[in-house]
Every structure is written in C-alpha cells, then in structure tokens.
C-alpha cells in the first residue's frame, strides 16, 4: 500500500477494493465499464506500467456521466452541497464515494497550491467518513483507508 500511496495512486487502490468487494455493485452498463477501467488501471500501476492518458480520460468521462456533472467541478463544491445533491437518489452512497475518491485524486495532482491540496484532501476524507457512517455495509478497506489518510497528513 505504501508504494501506491507514494505514487499518488491510492484512489485507484480504493476504487478497486470498493468495486471488487461489491459495495458499489450496480447492474447498469456504466458501472461495469467503470469497474473494468479502474481494474485495468490499478493492475497497470501495480505492475509498474505507465497509465495511458487515454485511459484516464475515458475514466473521467464515465465518472462525469455517473455523477451528472463535470468532475473538475468537484474541486469547487462544498461537501454538504455534494451530499445534498444526491440525497434522494437510490445510488447516492456510491456516487458520494466516487466523488470522495476523485477529490483525493485531485489532491494528489495539485502541487502548486498547498491550500487547495489540503482542502481537496480534507473534503475527500469527510466524504469517505460520511459514506462509512451512512452505508448499510461496513467496509474494512474504507475504514483502513480513512485511518491511513488521517494518519498520513
């Protein structure tokens, strides 16, 4: 796990564990496509292969379709606004969890603005905690990730 963290790819590790453990299992094609892309990307990272920008772009597009807005907007959204956005949706927990991981990914990509980096990371952790508290299924992987992120600040 330290290798993944040191490379800034813990968001992929989290998503693969979430998706493979069935926490976000859905029957629609969009989620299955996201699962395939995330799994392929995570395998590439773990095998020390370079991730193609085309794969990341495709993942971004699918995530945008799933969340219902451009993923870059996550950086400017308030955590409560995001939670409220999906309050009445059946798959709200999955969408909030996906958004939280994306915020963590963005925090790893930001280098020049330390305040933005910190905000994105904190928002991602807050959303993960919310998901852990509100989800009907307890996730050991999610709990470990939250603890690791809080310790690694």
Please identify what each model-predicted range represents:
Residues 35, 98-105, 144-148:
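"A position-specific structural signal for the A-helix of alpha-solenoid helical repeats
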Residues 3-23:
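Short, Lys/Arg-enriched N-terminal segments with co-localized hydrophobic residues
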Residues 113-153:
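Amphipathic alpha-helical binding modules
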Residues 45-56, 107-119:
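Short coil/turn connectors between adjacent alpha-helices in alpha-solenoid helical repeat scaffolds
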Residues 45, 63-67, 71, 107-111, ...:
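A conserved position within tetratricopeptide repeats
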């Amino acid at each position: 796990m330290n290798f993944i963290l040191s490379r800034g790819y813990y968001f992929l590790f989290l998503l693969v564990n979430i998706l493979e453990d069935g926490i976000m299992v859905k029957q629609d094609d969009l989620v299955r496509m996201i699962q395939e892309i995330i799994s392929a990307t995570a395998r590439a990272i773990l095998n020390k292969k370079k991730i193609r920008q085309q794969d990341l772009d495709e993942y971004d597009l699918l995530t945008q379709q799933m969340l219902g807005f451009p993923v870059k907007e996550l950086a400017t959204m308030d955590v409560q606004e995001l939670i409220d956005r999906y309050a009445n949706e059946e798959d709200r927990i999955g969408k909030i969890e996906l958004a939280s991981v994306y915020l963590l990914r963005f925090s790893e990509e930001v280098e020049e603005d330390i305040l933005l980096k910190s905000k994105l990371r904190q928002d991602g952790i807050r959303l993960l905690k919310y998901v852990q508290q509100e989800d009907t299924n307890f996730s050991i992987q999610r709990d470990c990730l939250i603890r690791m992120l809080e310790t690694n600040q």
